[in-house]
Amino acid sequence: MVKYLVGGMLFLIAISVSAQRITGTVNEQLAESKTLRPITGANVYWSGTSQAVSTDTAGKFSIPRITQSNLLVISFVGFRNDTVRVGAESELQVVLQNDQTLNEVTVRGNATTIDRLSPHQTEIITTRALAKAACCNLSESFETNASVSVSYSDAVTGAKQIQMLGLNGTYIQTNIENIPSIRGLASTFGLNFVPGTWIQSIDIGKGAGSVVNGYESMTGQINVELQKPDTREKLYLNTYINSFGRAETNLNLAHQLNEKWSTALLTHASALRSRIDQNKDGFLDLPLYTQYNVVNRWKYQSEKVMAQFGVKALYEDRLGGQKNFKSEMKGSDAVYGFGAKVNRYEFFSKVARLFPDKPYKGLGLIVNASLYDSKSYFGRSNYNGRQETLYGNLIYQSIIGNTNHTYKAGLSYLLDQYKERYRDMPLTRNESVPGAFFEYTYNHLDKFVLVGGGRVDFHNLYGTQWTPRLHLKYNLTDETTLRASVGKGFRVANPLAEYYGNLVSSRSVVFREQIRPEVSWNFGASVTQEFKLGEMDGNLIVDFYRTNFDNQLIADMEDPRYIVFYNLEGKAYANSFQAEANLTPLKRFELKLAYRLFDVKQTIRDMNNENVLLPRMMVSRDRVLFNAGYALPYDKWKFDATLQWNGKRRIPYMGPVSDHQHEASTMESTMSPSFYNLNAQVTRTFPKWDIYIGGENLTHFRQKDPIMNANYPFGENFDAGMAWGPVTGRMIYAGIRYKIIK
């Protein structure tokens, strides 16, 4: 029975009738099989009171009767609320209906949904959404999302990078099932290492995240949930091929061993073997590659214990550079080549102690160990990196008096061992960081929610770090929600891994000084307005966030001869404004229109060693996104199209070295043109399988000369790290999905 406190007399009355309980099960109905599936974590509460419980992993709940209300409200994100008038019955069976605004949600669609209950501004992307696009891996799941933009980091390696709130993905804490994963050396290719068919859902949170997950979140937090062993699909097969010659196969297998044990095997294999040079500059537009990726995971579920554990393994081999380059030519002075081999191994476990009679209470332990090993070369330059990581997080949660006041407290430990070498320059670093955290939540009937927390971490290299964060949510009306947040972030940068694409150049790498940790403060606010005009549903989301840096890693590429790393001296900030409208003018027809504005600046030293505040490189100031999606009845045919307009951005001066002045007037002058990009997909669904065909960059826009001085790759002006637009033109793809439901 969930504890509550509504006054002494009411408390005594509730205790006296505690034997009179309402129990039940909350389910959703699966469209494919018409069967019921339990909903875990649904909110069940008496209308107008703070008396509330949550459903367990079997969808079950138990709540005492009260005298103040006989209206029982059941709610869960992505489903329509259900209100049941309770009479003499004591056992309820509730089936929640999919909320239309979420039922059709897609990263490429117009109804990316804000979690209505969370004080964090959180967008939710579901499996159904991912199936509407090819989404071959995590990086491609954001290509049409208004908040997150994706681009290639250079014109040779094929590495992709994301931006949110005007800053690179390294400032976003990216977790896999609440375990920090795409960080450190893995930030180079990590987004490519999570196949789309493995993903169950993606949460995108703006602003500093929860202190429970660590101190590295600066502009946001992305959490990816993978397919679970007890998923409803015992077999899921996806095949994909595109006009560039890229092919991949994904196979997910899940098996329920008995009532408590289940297991799953997630596999992926992909390759690109076609040598493509559309712009005829003599370099491959995309690297050849082969990737093998597998996860074996297990789950144990009992009334009092839930445990998940498993292993991951990945191997990838990339080869790029000039079109006639072969791997045996590595180190050649005549032909420029790029190569990268990555091996990654990981063990993870999550164990939770449950308290069935006190669902608000829990104790969890997360343990993760990983090894990331990469060996790369860029022409005659070698770069090797190895990262060994051990992570542990012990979390206890409970209430203070009643469920209006909850808290999480715990201990964490992070061990990172880095061994890098670029040319003849070794970079070795061992970080050992024990920490403790506390986070308090006040929730008044989901109308006003306050989450305040702090953590203290004892870094062996950089001393004690204090990280406070605060999130607020207030519902002005049932249709209007305000959110605000402020928080500090702290991270240790890995310059070579984070600017990996810039190593494909003749630039000399210079560390002007010892690089200190990056420290920032992020604050922002948002308003979400739901509305209904006749038969048209919709919402409007407007937000503004600002990130101020106390210290930031500066990667100075103003001089085409160098990439110089040093600490911030002066100001650095990022302002982000976004307005997004989602409309459903007709049944199964969705429209989305979003505008985003970035104002991002940092202080750079000019040739006279004076500080100049300039717009940050490679950040588009403006972006407009328009999406239209339509589905025929029963989703037999689904159509989706997205048009993006990307505004101008400042790019480095790439003229002759003799003309370069490295002064403010020169640094301000070089801007890329704006461009449009169109993506579209059509899907035909059948009871057990889907067939889809689509295209990307249908406008066929390509950056002119993405590689500077491509004819002389060993000359002083060679640079492939200045890609600001698409390197390849129009791409057509097709695929098949097949599934067997348990």
Where on the chain are the PLM-derived regions?
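Flexible loop and strand-edge segments within Gram-negative outer membrane beta-barrel domains
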Residues: 272-293, 299-363, 369-387
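N-terminal periplasmic accessory domains that precede
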Residues: 90-95, 138-141, 160-163, 175, ...
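Membrane-embedded beta-barrel scaffold of Gram-negative outer-membrane proteins
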Residues: 364-376, 475, 483, 516-573
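Extracytoplasmic beta-strand/coil segments of soluble accessory domains associated
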Residues: 64, 139-183
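Short, acidic, small-residue-rich periplasmic hinge/interaction motif at the N-terminus
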Residues: 25-47, 75-79, 87-131, 139, ...
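Gram-negative outer-membrane beta-barrel transporters
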Residues: 443, 544-548, 567-656, 737-739
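Short acidic/polar hinge/loop motifs at secondary-structure boundaries
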Residues: 61-64, 179-206, 294, 512
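C-terminal beta-signal and adjacent terminal beta-strands/loops
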Residues: 645-659, 683-742
